[in-house]
Amino acid sequence: MPFRSNNPITRDELLSRFFPQFHPVTTFNSGLSGGSFLIEHQGQRFVVRQPHDPDAPRFAFLRQYRALSQLPACIAPKPHLYLRDWMVVDYLPGEVKTYLPDTNELAGLLYYLHQQPRFGWRITLLPLLELYWQQSDPARRTVGWLRRLKRLRKAREPRPLRLSPLHMDVHAGNLVHSASGLKLIDWEYAGDGDIALELAAVWVENTDQHRQLVNDYATRAKIYPAQLWRQVRRWFPWLLMLKAGWFEYRWRQTGDQQFIRLADDTWRQLLIKQ
């Protein structure tokens, strides 16, 4: 249920107006982007979310609601309310583990997602790369960073192998192991893009695991594994730059030292993969 209002409301106003019988249970602070909180009434639970990035355009949060509204409940939480700066979605019972599931199981989930109707908006990385450069700490901007940005701008993004709806933040902390199977949470980066971009963006433990995931996906999608892996590799420079830039951007926003450490580690990976 989208509810349009130009006036922001507080958490207490949200609960008293729309969920008067519910009460807060706990706050989630997992992940790098921020937290949300859980409300409950007689065993029914919802997750109340706010935009992770306070500087992001408002349409980005609305897009997340629209994506969840069209996705099947077997892979994503169902949304119940959207209004300015707030979204309420189903709580997904299950276990969130610290490691990825079996690659074949994960490949099945991603392949099923990629068979769904497209969302209607494209994921384009170059505008994000340029935004992160512009919004980063000037003291952290380097000639090497600018050189890589110009190189990618000149090269342009790889031509999509197959265009599908993507989640774009697949890691262990965003996967719920439920009784009915794997489900994905945190859809704030969702959009339409190349299936190989999704596979390239999965937070894997090592190259062997990555290759196996791509091979398992290729089998389901009836694509030659070597062809799919080549396309995945084409996205690596873009994704490493995206991660490094995002960490730099979040460092300037929050001052949290973890983002500097993650940014430095990603810059080292870029040097290794040159």
UniProtKB/Swiss-Prot annotation:
Enzyme's top EC category: transferase
SUPFAM superfamilies reported in the protein's UniProt record: Protein kinase-like (PK-like)
EC code(s) of this entry: 2.7.1.89
Reaction catalyzed: thiamine + ATP = thiamine phosphate + ADP + H(+)
Family per record: Belongs to the thiamine kinase family.
Job of this protein: Catalyzes the ATP-dependent phosphorylation of thiamine to thiamine phosphate. Is involved in thiamine salvage.
Protein's UniProt name: Thiamine kinase
